[in-house]
Amino acid sequence: MTMSRLPLAVAPLILLQACSSFNSESPQSAPQVPSAELSRPETITPQTYVMRGQAVIGHETRTIQPCGSQHQYWLELPKNVRPEAEKLTRKPYQPVYAEVIGYLEPPSHRGFDSDYTGRFVVKQVNMLTAENPKRCDQPLRPTQVLGNEPFWSLKFDNSKQASFAMMGEDKQSLKLKDRKLTQTTRRYEFDDANLQMSNKLCNDTMSDTLYGWTGVITIDGQTRQGCATLSNSDTTLSWTGNYVAQSTETAGFTVSMTLLPDHTAITRYEYPDNSPATEERGFWQQLNNKQVQVIMTRHQQQYLVSQRIFTLDGNKLIAKQEKVGDIVYPIANGGLVLYKGE
């Protein structure tokens, strides 16, 4: 089977030779993480992460523009969330601020999502609000629970301590003794209180805000119920940066890859004869603490899905296979080796 992309990407990778004289640091001892491989699709499971930004939620358009980005992804919301999200706005396609937890998938070839680099599949809502859609400039926030009548809040100061505040009273510091976390529940035991969080949609009666969690706290002999959010920090951003191949003597071109904080990815193939560079665009996401998945969905602005899984080794990333369409190709000469720039 012949593909038009093959001479531009797969074939150059087969020719590519990366520098082999680099002495990598010995890996630190850590729990064994199952390795993902393109030839074994069942091993590939993206970790969920937080994406926050401005969203538009309507019948034919559902998008999210990540904070600090000009890029948009198609937003795939759970069926039970869409009607609740649409109730937040007073007019169709009114922007809202969104914090959603999930992962990216390639868009369909045809359909509402086909014009986008990827579609963000939402597994959990952290927060949706129409009250102030321009919240990207606000500082990142820890896990917190908020309640009304009277207003009260519990916010985590760090992994071992939280603060409880109620209007008109002094703030209380709570030392964490134990916690049990699952995908749908979180239970925290403090020295003088306990908190139970559940992954259920929660409406704030005082604002146009939808929260993804409910929280029940028992403190000083009283039980209070409120709405809750998890921390809105994306903990996978350590992968971001520019990566280049150090040796391309036999290939006759330079390969570079850029992973951006909005999870977009760009791969460029540049040639010494000043012919136009070949560019692919797509997205990236963490599979585990040692592997990152990079999926390209546009080749020279044309729809084409290709995928590589890079494994971290010291300060370099190594991909030994590439999947174009449904076919997995081996990358010769030890694979594509990219080094992170300063």
Pin down the residues of each PLM region.
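C-terminal motif of bacterial Sec signal peptides marking the signal peptidase cleavage site
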Residues: 15-18
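Bacterial signal peptide processing site
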Residues: 20-23
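Post-signal peptide N-terminal segment of mature Sec-exported envelope proteins
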Residues: 27-56
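Tryptophan-anchored aromatic micro-motifs
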Residues: 47, 51-54, 59, 129-152, ...
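Flexible glycine-rich surface loops and low-complexity tracts that mediate binding to linear polymers
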Residues: 53, 90-116
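Contiguous, well-ordered beta-strand patches that form the walls/edges
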Residues: 56, 60-62, 68-87, 101, ...
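OB-fold/S1-family single-stranded nucleic acid-binding modules
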Residues: 107-135
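Lipid interaction determinants
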Residues: 206, 210, 216-281, 290-342
